[in-house]
């Protein structure tokens, strides 16, 4: 385990990075290097689910019990 014992401590660097971005009023979920990919995936899933449920609810209100057919 000498690699683990002699590993450099990167916490102060990352802490400075996050604190600097936070001082510039950047939202926490937009600071990280992968945040764009994560937020894009989340937004697609969230709005896709919302749209699908609104579509299904409107079909149910109109009296159709299936997604596509007129039955």
Swiss-Prot record:
Pathway: Energy metabolism; oxidative phosphorylation. It is a single-pass membrane protein. The chain crosses the membrane at residues 36-58. One of its GO terms (biological process) is oxidative phosphorylation. It is found in: Mitochondrion inner membrane. GO terms for cellular component: mitochondrial inner membrane. Its main location: mitochondrion. Signal peptide: none annotated. Residues 59-71 are mitochondrial intermembrane. Residues 1-35 are mitochondrial matrix. InterPro entries: COX7a. Pfam families: COX7a. Keywords: Membrane, Mitochondrion, Mitochondrion inner membrane, Transmembrane, Transmembrane helix. Component of the cytochrome c oxidase (complex IV, CIV), a multisubunit enzyme composed of 11 subunits. The complex is composed of a catalytic core of 3 subunits Cox1, Cox2 and Cox3, encoded in the mitochondrial DNA, and 8 supernumerary subunits Cox4, Cox5a/Cox5, Cox6, Cox7, Cox8, Cox7a/Cox9, Cox6b/Cox12 and Cox6a/Cox13, which are encoded in the nuclear genome. Belongs to the cytochrome c oxidase VIIa family. Component of the cytochrome c oxidase, the last enzyme in the mitochondrial electron transport chain which drives oxidative phosphorylation. The respiratory chain contains 3 multisubunit complexes succinate dehydrogenase (complex II, CII), ubiquinol-cytochrome c oxidoreductase (cytochrome b-c1 complex, complex III, CIII) and cytochrome c oxidase (complex IV, CIV), that cooperate to transfer electrons derived from NADH and succinate to molecular oxygen, creating an electrochemical gradient over the inner membrane that drives transmembrane transport and the ATP synthase. This is Cytochrome c oxidase subunit 7, mitochondrial. It comes from Neurospora crassa (strain ATCC 24698 / 74-OR23-1A / CBS 708.71 / DSM 1257 / FGSC 987).
